[in-house]
């Protein structure tokens, strides 16, 4: 699998962080994302230009060390970037998470080729990236079997199998995968490229939301992947390095969506407060719960930092609890928003309709709410 030398050798620009990054993201969202949200939602338009633009600002390089093209600021500003994008569009917020997840995989590998040659391009958005770890995460939780087999061969592995849905990918996109090493009980993790020989990308389903996420079924048929592209083999310990950051950054999606639902409820209350006051999950009480989750997730993000360490069991438990709470708040906030809106919320394609559909994704994307509760039960 090859990546163009011209891409690898491009000079790195200085990325923004903290307040400067957040302000620049708000401006980019207002100018380039907000006008396209309806087309992203209803027509499945993929916002590639916006995704590349926020990469050049620093949306994907916060958890990446400075020596590999990032800012070295850690998971916290990455989570905040996902949160702020998700306030406007969960599809794009999800893809911001997908890309950050791939950056996180590369940040935590010991593979020098991936860290030195590929990570700087992913950290700045020159190479767009997704994550194919839904199946592996469910496998390691005892929910389903791994779907790819890796057969060792000279120089690497031959991959065969299928990943049902992988998001934010295309012919030139990168994404993480996991496979069982044939004849063993061991597993590997690696980086695949959408255009690699032996890989077919298929779009053959229509989703009720998040249509603009470039989500494909991935069919591997005798696809060769070299040792240069392997993140870890075996990958048991490596998964422990990436797990907490992978899960916690998803909380940003729930934070952003819930905040927007609250803001919309308050806007509706300007004319309907006299009747909406009798509803449950009113904006003020939702805001209090949201702020509690926000502060907790920010604290956990600071504890995780920029990786390279396995977090304590207590930190991991809090991360999983926070992710579950993000799902629950998203569902409650979007349902309350629909009830606050009334009949206008029932109009197809309205913002209220979209936020309700998006909220179910927060609760269903891996790790789904039922997955999280299963893991928490096993940790009791």
Residue map of PLM features:
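Glycine-rich phosphate/cofactor-binding loops in nucleotide/flavin-utilizing enzymes
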Residues: 3, 343-380
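Glycine-rich flavin
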Residues: 38, 46-56, 60-160
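Glycine-rich phosphate/pyrophosphate-binding beta-alpha loops
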Residues: 164-169, 247, 362
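A short core secondary-structure module
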Residues: 165-199
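Amphipathic alpha-helices that form helix-helix packing interfaces
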Residues: 251, 258-261, 265, 286-300, ...
């Amino acid at each position: 699998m090859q990546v163009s030398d011209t891409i690898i050798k491009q000079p790195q620009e200085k990325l923004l962080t903290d307040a400067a990054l957040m302000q620049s993201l708000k401006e980019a969202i207002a100018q380039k994302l907000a006008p396209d949200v309806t087309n992203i939602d209803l027509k499945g338009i993929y916002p590639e230009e916006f995704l590349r633009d926020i990469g050049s600002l620093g949306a994907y390089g916060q958890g990446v060390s400075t020596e590999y093209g990032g800012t070295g600021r850690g998971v916290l500003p990455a989570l905040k970037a996902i949160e702020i994008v998700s306030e406007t569009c969960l599809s794009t917020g999800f893809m911001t998470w997908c890309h950050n997840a791939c950056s996180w995989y590369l940040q935590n590998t010991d593979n020098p080729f991936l860290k030195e040659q590929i990570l700087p391009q992913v950290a700045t958005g020159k190479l767009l990236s997704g994550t194919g770890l839904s199946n592996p995460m469910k496998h390691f939780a005892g929910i389903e079997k791994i779907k790819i087999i890796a057969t060792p061969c000279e120089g690497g592995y031959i991959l065969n199998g299928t990943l049902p849905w992988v998001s934010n990918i295309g012919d030139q996109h990168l994404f993480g995968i996991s496979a069982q090493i044939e004849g063993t009980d061991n597993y590997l993790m690696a980086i695949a490229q959408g255009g690699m020989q032996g890989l077919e990308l298929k779009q053959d389903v229509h989703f009720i939301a998040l249509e603009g996420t470039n989500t494909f079924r991935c069919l591997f048929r005798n696809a060769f992947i070299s040792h240069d592209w392997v993140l870890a083999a075996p990958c048991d310990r490596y998964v422990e390095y990436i797990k907490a950051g992978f899960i916690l950054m998803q909380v940003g999606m729930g934070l952003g969506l819930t905040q927007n639902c609250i803001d919309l409820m308050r806007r509706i209350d300007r004319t309907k407060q006299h009747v909406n006051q009798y509803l449950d999950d009113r904006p003020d009480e939702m805001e209090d719960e949201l702020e509690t989750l926000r502060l907790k997730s920010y604290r956990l993000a600071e504890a995780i930092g920029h990786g390279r360490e396995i977090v304590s069991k207590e930190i991991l438990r809090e991360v999983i609890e926070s992710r579950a709470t993000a799902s629950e708040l998203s569902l409650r906030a979007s349902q309350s928003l629909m009830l606050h809106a009334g009949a206008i919320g029932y109009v197809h394609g309205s913002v209220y309709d979209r936020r309700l559909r998006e909220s179910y994704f927060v609760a269903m994307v891996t790790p789904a709410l039922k997955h999280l509760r299963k893991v928490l039960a096993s940790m009791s």
